[in-house]
Amino acid sequence: MDAAKMYGAVLACTDEAVLPVSQVFDAIRELGNEGVEKLDPLVITSASSLSKFPVESSSVDLVVLIWKSLDFPIDQLTQEVLRVLKAGGTTLIRKSSQSAVGSGDKMIPDLENKLLLAGFSEIQALQSSVIKAKKPSWKIGSSFALKKVVKSSPKVQIDFDSDLIDENSLLSEEDLKKPELPSGDCEIGPTRKACKNCSCGRAEEEEKVLKLGLTAEQINNPQSACGSCGLGDAFRCSTCPYKGLPAFKMGEKVALSGNFLAADI
């Protein structure tokens, strides 16, 4: 790809006092681009002594860092590179031709971690002494909607040609007959009382029903089979004849005065 069309503005930085343009072109060729001679890069020497690049923010397509020393201020430089790069711009870091042999082996792993923490993406080591990274095309704080994948429910294939069994064919004539209820000779009404000429046994059952209530004998001589009748409703059985009366002592007779119901006024 033509480098002049791909990179409109190129910035080259180095910690040396002099940087030949040929070294900048060689670094750009490592990206697989042709026609680098058409580029007109802006070169900054002794960049380690600068706190800020004399370049406007988001104005550069490609930043090439060529460094000789291993202790260059990478943290400060990455922030400046991010500032001057356009969204989606590329940075290329490589060691100088005058660097010590084997120094890149120690520099590359450390650079990858620092570039990642600084906010770069698509970090890639091209050679033992060259590393490439990109500035993300999105901005910090930007948001976008996630497309929800709509999964279609599985369709059930129904074979209408298959033989279906009629449910009614499984019932016999006896199953379809309504059951006959046993009818008594008493008139069945809402009260269900036995008639005068009852012969079904309802009259005998009604005679056996015990009506709960207090007799005069129970009031005068209270007796308790369970021993809890005089303790109150909380201790009485559900069928206790004394239910509803206040607590009393068994065998004790309570006498009221003659003027108990007389008005005080």
From Swiss-Prot:
Q: Region entry Fe-S binding site A: which residue ranges?
A: 186-200
**Residues annotated as region Fe-S binding site B?**
226-240
Residue segments, region N-terminal SAM-like domain = 1-147
Which keywords, in A-to-Z order, does the entry hold? 2Fe-2S, 4Fe-4S, Cytoplasm, Iron, Iron-sulfur, Metal-binding, Mitochondrion
- The short sequence motif called Cx2C motif 2 sits at 237-240
Chain segments carrying region Linker: 147-176
Regarding protein family, the annotation reads: Belongs to the anamorsin family.
Q: Mind telling me what this protein is named?
A: Anamorsin homolog
